[in-house]
Amino acid sequence: MERKQEAQVTNECDFLITNSKFMLENFIKDTPKWKEHSTAIPNGYDEEDFKGLINQRNGQDKFVITHTGTLYGKRNLTEFLEGLKIAIEGNHVNREDIEIRLVGNVHESVAAEYAEKYNLQGKIKTTGYMNHRDSIQMLYNSDILLLIIGKVKGAENFYSGKIFEYIRADRPVLAIVPEGGAAAEV
């Protein structure tokens, strides 16, 4: 159904703009006419969103890992938490020294299930929905930012727009993304 809608839209447009070269290359492969009538313009961030915010890490004794946005279906914490479990069991990370913040629409019951499964009770905090500015402040209040692109067909062709806000926040980014794809290239 999505492919049909996509074809309807692209058949009617005069010029095609995508936000990644990977996506553009796929359009050109499917419809060669786009080679001469298309371009890729990457997403970015709005500098105004960062003005007046305090660029300061959490100031706690915890190492704060933050994910902003929605987790659902194949975009989930499983790979990250499996890796963290290995690091904790190998004594590379002290469970007591970390806090995982899920900023956005992540149901508390989902976070509780992860906490129980990975023995991280009290370590996974949810904030619920936050306005955009407060969400960006949470980036500044973090030690590392978690970016997850789910394992779905075509995931290598796109990235989340938040990647540019993550980079602008000047924190390390732990990216669980398709190798060689658009998000990995950024």
Residues covered by each model-derived region:
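Nucleotide-sugar-dependent
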Residues: 75, 131-137, 145-164, 174-185
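A short, active-site helix/loop in glycosyltransferases that binds the activated sugar's phosphate group
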Residues: 7-37, 184
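Short acidic alpha-helix that forms the nucleotide-activated donor recognition element
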Residues: 8-11, 113, 131-142, 168
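Carbohydrate-associated surface elements
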Residues: 22, 41-44
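Nucleotide-activated donor-binding/catalytic signature segment of Leloir-type glycosyltransferases, i.e.
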Residues: 92-104, 109-134
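Nucleotide-sugar donor phosphate/pyrophosphate-binding loop at the beta->alpha transition
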Residues: 1-8, 47
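Acidic anion/phosphate-binding donor-loop and adjacent secondary structure
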Residues: 28-29, 44-61
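Conserved donor-binding/catalytic core segment of Leloir-type glycosyltransferases
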Residues: 57-75, 81-82
